[in-house]
UniProtKB/Swiss-Prot annotation:
Its main location: secreted. The keyword Ribosomal protein does not apply. A long coiled coil structure formed by 3 polypeptide chains connects the central nodule to the C-terminal domains (distal nodules). The long C-terminal ends of the alpha chains fold back, contributing a fourth strand to the coiled coil structure. Heterohexamer; disulfide linked. Contains 2 sets of 3 non-identical chains (alpha, beta and gamma). The 2 heterotrimers are in head to head conformation with the N-termini in a small central domain. Coiled coil: none annotated. The keyword Lipid biosynthesis does not apply. One of its GO terms (cellular component) is extracellular region. This is Fibrinogen alpha chain. It comes from Cervus nippon. GO terms for biological process: adaptive immune response; blood coagulation; innate immune response. It comes from the Eukaryota.
Length: 19
């Protein structure tokens, strides 16, 4: 997953970040 969004940072750990 990409870390484009600041809030996605926590999503990255779960593998659900913004692409």
């Amino acid at each position: 997953a990409d870390g484009s969004d600041p809030a996605s940072s926590e999503f990255l750990a779960e593998g659900g970040g913004v692409r």
